[in-house]
UniProtKB/Swiss-Prot annotation:
Ubiquitinated when soluble in the cytoplasm, leading to its degradation by the proteasome. Interaction with EMC2 prevents its ubiquitination and degradation. Component of the ER membrane protein complex (EMC). Interacts with WNK1 (via amphipathic alpha-helix region); promoting the ER membrane protein complex assembly by preventing EMC2 ubiquitination. This is ER membrane protein complex subunit 2. Keywords: Acetylation, Endoplasmic reticulum, Membrane, Repeat, TPR repeat, Ubl conjugation.
Length: 297
Protein backbone atom coordinates (compact mmCIF):
# COMPACT_ATOMS: atom_id res chain seq x y z
CA UNK A 1 0.00 0.00 0.00
CA UNK A 2 1.38 3.40 -1.02
CA UNK A 3 2.41 5.80 1.72
CA UNK A 4 0.30 8.90 2.24
CA UNK A 5 3.37 11.12 1.94
CA UNK A 6 4.25 9.61 -1.45
CA UNK A 7 0.69 9.36 -2.74
CA UNK A 8 -0.13 13.00 -2.06
CA UNK A 9 3.42 14.41 -2.14
CA UNK A 10 3.24 15.91 1.35
CA UNK A 11 5.90 16.35 4.02
CA UNK A 12 5.68 14.92 7.52
CA UNK A 13 5.22 18.48 8.84
CA UNK A 14 2.16 18.91 6.62
CA UNK A 15 0.79 15.59 7.84
CA UNK A 16 1.35 16.64 11.47
CA UNK A 17 -0.40 19.96 10.83
CA UNK A 18 -3.30 18.17 9.16
CA UNK A 19 -3.70 15.95 12.24
CA UNK A 20 -3.72 19.06 14.45
CA UNK A 21 -6.36 20.69 12.24
CA UNK A 22 -8.58 17.60 12.48
CA UNK A 23 -8.23 17.66 16.30
CA UNK A 24 -9.19 21.32 16.49
CA UNK A 25 -12.22 20.73 14.27
CA UNK A 26 -13.25 17.55 16.14
CA UNK A 27 -13.39 15.77 12.78
CA UNK A 28 -14.80 12.24 12.73
CA UNK A 29 -12.92 11.23 9.55
CA UNK A 30 -11.52 8.12 11.22
CA UNK A 31 -10.19 6.42 8.08
CA UNK A 32 -8.06 9.42 7.10
CA UNK A 33 -6.82 9.93 10.65
CA UNK A 34 -5.74 6.28 10.79
CA UNK A 35 -3.96 6.45 7.43
CA UNK A 36 -2.09 9.68 8.13
CA UNK A 37 -1.52 9.04 11.83
CA UNK A 38 -0.22 5.49 11.42
CA UNK A 39 2.40 6.66 8.93
CA UNK A 40 3.41 9.57 11.16
CA UNK A 41 3.88 7.26 14.13
CA UNK A 42 5.74 4.54 12.24
CA UNK A 43 7.91 6.67 9.95
CA UNK A 44 8.37 10.00 11.71
CA UNK A 45 7.79 9.29 15.41
CA UNK A 46 11.27 10.48 16.38
CA UNK A 47 10.63 13.87 14.75
CA UNK A 48 7.30 14.60 16.41
CA UNK A 49 8.59 15.46 19.88
CA UNK A 50 5.86 15.77 22.50
CA UNK A 51 3.23 15.94 19.73
CA UNK A 52 3.50 12.18 19.41
CA UNK A 53 1.47 11.58 22.59
CA UNK A 54 -1.60 13.52 21.50
CA UNK A 55 -1.29 11.86 18.08
CA UNK A 56 -1.22 8.42 19.74
CA UNK A 57 -4.46 9.32 21.51
CA UNK A 58 -6.03 10.73 18.35
CA UNK A 59 -5.07 7.69 16.28
CA UNK A 60 -6.24 5.28 18.97
CA UNK A 61 -9.75 6.76 19.12
CA UNK A 62 -9.98 6.80 15.31
CA UNK A 63 -8.69 3.21 15.13
CA UNK A 64 -11.45 2.07 17.51
CA UNK A 65 -14.01 3.78 15.30
CA UNK A 66 -12.47 2.28 12.15
CA UNK A 67 -12.21 -1.27 13.51
CA UNK A 68 -8.40 -1.35 13.79
CA UNK A 69 -8.05 -2.83 17.27
CA UNK A 70 -4.44 -3.83 16.55
CA UNK A 71 -3.47 -0.21 16.00
CA UNK A 72 -5.62 1.00 18.91
CA UNK A 73 -3.90 -1.46 21.26
CA UNK A 74 -0.43 -0.43 20.04
CA UNK A 75 -1.18 3.27 20.69
CA UNK A 76 -2.69 2.47 24.09
CA UNK A 77 0.37 0.46 25.15
CA UNK A 78 2.69 3.33 24.20
CA UNK A 79 0.58 5.77 26.21
CA UNK A 80 0.54 3.42 29.22
CA UNK A 81 4.35 3.23 29.17
CA UNK A 82 4.66 7.00 29.08
CA UNK A 83 1.82 7.84 31.50
CA UNK A 84 1.33 4.95 33.96
CA UNK A 85 -1.63 5.52 36.25
CA UNK A 86 -3.03 8.38 34.16
CA UNK A 87 -6.81 8.73 34.40
CA UNK A 88 -6.86 9.91 30.81
CA UNK A 89 -5.14 6.73 29.64
CA UNK A 90 -7.44 4.63 31.83
CA UNK A 91 -10.39 6.29 30.12
CA UNK A 92 -8.93 5.29 26.76
CA UNK A 93 -8.69 1.72 28.06
CA UNK A 94 -12.37 1.95 28.95
CA UNK A 95 -13.20 3.17 25.45
CA UNK A 96 -11.44 0.11 24.03
CA UNK A 97 -13.56 -2.09 26.31
CA UNK A 98 -16.63 -0.31 24.93
CA UNK A 99 -15.54 -0.98 21.34
CA UNK A 100 -15.18 -4.65 22.28
CA UNK A 101 -18.66 -4.51 23.90
CA UNK A 102 -17.11 -5.33 27.29
CA UNK A 103 -19.44 -2.82 28.89
CA UNK A 104 -19.25 -4.17 32.45
CA UNK A 105 -15.45 -3.95 32.40
CA UNK A 106 -15.64 -0.40 31.07
CA UNK A 107 -18.12 0.70 33.74
CA UNK A 108 -16.00 -0.85 36.52
CA UNK A 109 -12.98 1.03 35.21
CA UNK A 110 -14.87 4.34 35.03
CA UNK A 111 -16.20 3.77 38.56
CA UNK A 112 -12.63 3.32 39.83
CA UNK A 113 -11.62 6.56 38.12
CA UNK A 114 -14.55 8.37 39.74
CA UNK A 115 -13.68 6.97 43.18
CA UNK A 116 -10.22 8.51 42.81
CA UNK A 117 -11.51 11.70 41.14
CA UNK A 118 -15.26 12.41 41.56
CA UNK A 119 -14.94 15.51 39.33
CA UNK A 120 -13.78 13.52 36.30
CA UNK A 121 -16.48 14.56 33.83
CA UNK A 122 -15.06 12.48 30.97
CA UNK A 123 -15.49 9.22 32.91
CA UNK A 124 -19.05 10.17 33.88
CA UNK A 125 -19.93 10.91 30.27
CA UNK A 126 -18.48 7.60 29.11
CA UNK A 127 -20.72 5.77 31.59
CA UNK A 128 -23.73 7.61 30.20
CA UNK A 129 -22.65 6.74 26.64
CA UNK A 130 -22.56 3.06 27.62
CA UNK A 131 -26.10 3.20 29.03
CA UNK A 132 -27.28 4.72 25.77
CA UNK A 133 -25.41 2.12 23.71
CA UNK A 134 -27.12 -0.59 25.75
CA UNK A 135 -30.51 1.01 25.16
CA UNK A 136 -30.85 1.71 28.88
CA UNK A 137 -32.27 5.20 28.49
CA UNK A 138 -33.83 5.33 31.97
CA UNK A 139 -30.43 4.66 33.58
CA UNK A 140 -28.76 7.16 31.25
CA UNK A 141 -31.34 9.78 32.28
CA UNK A 142 -30.74 9.07 35.97
CA UNK A 143 -26.97 9.39 35.59
CA UNK A 144 -27.26 12.55 33.50
CA UNK A 145 -29.47 14.15 36.15
CA UNK A 146 -26.93 13.23 38.83
CA UNK A 147 -24.17 14.67 36.66
CA UNK A 148 -26.06 17.94 36.09
CA UNK A 149 -26.59 18.37 39.83
CA UNK A 150 -22.81 18.87 40.03
CA UNK A 151 -22.13 20.42 36.62
CA UNK A 152 -25.21 22.52 35.96
CA UNK A 153 -23.47 24.62 33.32
CA UNK A 154 -22.74 21.74 30.94
CA UNK A 155 -24.88 22.70 27.95
CA UNK A 156 -24.01 19.57 25.99
CA UNK A 157 -25.33 17.45 28.86
CA UNK A 158 -28.58 19.44 29.03
CA UNK A 159 -29.13 18.89 25.32
CA UNK A 160 -28.33 15.20 25.60
CA UNK A 161 -30.83 14.90 28.46
CA UNK A 162 -33.48 16.69 26.38
CA UNK A 163 -32.92 14.22 23.53
CA UNK A 164 -33.26 11.27 25.91
CA UNK A 165 -36.51 12.62 27.32
CA UNK A 166 -37.83 13.10 23.78
CA UNK A 167 -36.95 9.49 22.98
CA UNK A 168 -38.88 8.44 26.09
CA UNK A 169 -41.83 10.70 25.08
CA UNK A 170 -41.46 12.70 28.30
CA UNK A 171 -42.00 16.03 26.57
CA UNK A 172 -42.58 18.15 29.68
CA UNK A 173 -39.11 17.30 31.01
CA UNK A 174 -37.57 17.70 27.55
CA UNK A 175 -39.10 21.18 27.40
CA UNK A 176 -37.58 22.03 30.80
CA UNK A 177 -34.10 21.01 29.58
CA UNK A 178 -34.48 23.12 26.44
CA UNK A 179 -35.67 26.09 28.54
CA UNK A 180 -32.42 25.80 30.51
CA UNK A 181 -30.47 25.87 27.25
CA UNK A 182 -32.38 28.88 25.90
CA UNK A 183 -31.71 30.82 29.11
CA UNK A 184 -27.95 30.53 28.55
CA UNK A 185 -28.12 30.57 24.72
CA UNK A 186 -30.96 32.96 23.82
CA UNK A 187 -29.61 33.48 20.30
CA UNK A 188 -29.38 29.80 19.36
CA UNK A 189 -32.08 29.28 16.73
CA UNK A 190 -31.84 25.49 16.90
CA UNK A 191 -32.74 25.41 20.59
CA UNK A 192 -35.75 27.65 19.91
CA UNK A 193 -36.79 25.41 17.03
CA UNK A 194 -36.48 22.22 19.06
CA UNK A 195 -38.38 23.74 21.98
CA UNK A 196 -41.14 24.75 19.56
CA UNK A 197 -41.26 21.20 18.18
CA UNK A 198 -41.63 19.75 21.68
CA UNK A 199 -44.45 22.17 22.50
CA UNK A 200 -46.14 21.37 19.19
CA UNK A 201 -45.95 17.66 19.99
CA UNK A 202 -47.46 18.22 23.45
CA UNK A 203 -50.50 19.78 21.80
CA UNK A 204 -53.29 21.85 23.29
CA UNK A 205 -53.98 25.50 22.54
CA UNK A 206 -51.54 26.95 25.09
CA UNK A 207 -48.67 24.73 23.91
CA UNK A 208 -49.48 25.45 20.26
CA UNK A 209 -49.30 29.18 20.91
CA UNK A 210 -45.91 28.74 22.59
CA UNK A 211 -44.84 26.56 19.69
CA UNK A 212 -45.76 29.23 17.15
CA UNK A 213 -43.98 31.88 19.22
CA UNK A 214 -40.72 29.95 19.33
CA UNK A 215 -40.85 28.86 15.70
CA UNK A 216 -41.16 32.58 14.92
CA UNK A 217 -38.22 33.34 17.24
CA UNK A 218 -36.11 30.67 15.52
CA UNK A 219 -36.92 32.31 12.18
CA UNK A 220 -36.03 35.73 13.54
CA UNK A 221 -32.64 34.39 14.60
CA UNK A 222 -32.09 32.54 11.32
CA UNK A 223 -34.40 33.39 8.44
CA UNK A 224 -33.08 30.41 6.46
CA UNK A 225 -34.37 27.88 8.96
CA UNK A 226 -36.90 26.10 6.74
CA UNK A 227 -37.86 23.65 9.46
CA UNK A 228 -38.90 26.56 11.67
CA UNK A 229 -40.82 28.08 8.75
CA UNK A 230 -42.76 24.86 8.21
CA UNK A 231 -43.28 24.66 11.97
CA UNK A 232 -44.69 28.18 12.01
CA UNK A 233 -47.10 27.21 9.24
CA UNK A 234 -48.20 24.03 11.01
CA UNK A 235 -48.62 25.55 14.48
CA UNK A 236 -50.48 28.63 13.21
CA UNK A 237 -52.74 26.42 11.06
CA UNK A 238 -53.64 24.23 14.03
CA UNK A 239 -54.37 27.25 16.22
CA UNK A 240 -56.56 28.72 13.47
CA UNK A 241 -58.64 25.54 13.40
CA UNK A 242 -58.75 25.01 17.17
CA UNK A 243 -62.33 25.27 18.48
CA UNK A 244 -61.09 26.74 21.78
CA UNK A 245 -59.39 29.69 20.06
CA UNK A 246 -61.19 33.04 19.92
CA UNK A 247 -62.32 34.49 16.60
CA UNK A 248 -59.51 37.08 16.71
CA UNK A 249 -56.90 34.43 17.52
CA UNK A 250 -58.11 32.31 14.61
CA UNK A 251 -58.01 35.28 12.24
CA UNK A 252 -54.49 36.31 13.35
CA UNK A 253 -53.12 32.80 13.02
CA UNK A 254 -54.68 32.39 9.59
CA UNK A 255 -52.58 35.39 8.56
CA UNK A 256 -49.44 33.89 10.12
CA UNK A 257 -50.02 30.56 8.37
CA UNK A 258 -50.72 32.26 5.05
CA UNK A 259 -47.52 34.30 5.36
CA UNK A 260 -45.48 31.19 6.22
CA UNK A 261 -46.91 29.27 3.25
CA UNK A 262 -46.09 32.15 0.89
CA UNK A 263 -42.51 32.25 2.24
CA UNK A 264 -42.15 28.50 1.71
CA UNK A 265 -43.46 28.95 -1.83
CA UNK A 266 -40.96 31.72 -2.46
CA UNK A 267 -38.08 29.68 -1.02
CA UNK A 268 -38.81 26.80 -3.39
CA UNK A 269 -39.05 29.15 -6.36
CA UNK A 270 -35.58 30.50 -5.65
CA UNK A 271 -34.01 27.16 -4.72
CA UNK A 272 -31.66 25.60 -7.24
CA UNK A 273 -33.86 22.59 -7.96
CA UNK A 274 -34.79 20.82 -11.15
CA UNK A 275 -38.01 21.97 -12.81
CA UNK A 276 -39.70 18.66 -11.98
CA UNK A 277 -38.80 18.89 -8.28
CA UNK A 278 -39.86 22.53 -8.13
CA UNK A 279 -43.18 21.68 -9.78
CA UNK A 280 -44.03 19.10 -7.11
CA UNK A 281 -42.72 21.30 -4.28
CA UNK A 282 -44.81 24.25 -5.42
CA UNK A 283 -47.85 22.00 -5.77
CA UNK A 284 -47.45 21.00 -2.12
CA UNK A 285 -47.33 24.65 -1.06
CA UNK A 286 -50.34 25.49 -3.24
CA UNK A 287 -52.22 22.69 -1.49
CA UNK A 288 -51.31 24.33 1.84
CA UNK A 289 -52.76 27.64 0.67
CA UNK A 290 -55.89 25.93 -0.64
CA UNK A 291 -56.37 24.22 2.72
CA UNK A 292 -56.08 27.59 4.44
CA UNK A 293 -58.71 29.10 2.17
CA UNK A 294 -61.08 26.20 2.82
CA UNK A 295 -60.57 26.53 6.58
CA UNK A 296 -61.05 30.29 6.44
CA UNK A 297 -64.28 30.01 4.49
Amino acid sequence: MAKVSELYDVTWEEMRDKMRKWREENSRNSEQIVEVGEELINEYGSKLGDDIWIIYEQVMIAALDYGRDDLALFCLQELRRQFPGSHRVKRLTGMRFEAMERYDDAIQLYDRILQEDPTNTAARKRKIAIRKAQGKNVEAIRELNEYLEQFVGDQEAWHELAELYINEHDYAKAAFCLEELMMTNPHNHLYCQQYAEVKYTQGGLENLELSRKYFAQALKLNNRNMRALFGLYMSASHIASNPKASAKTKKDNMKYASWAASQINRAYQFAGRSKKETKYSLKAVEDMLETLQITQS
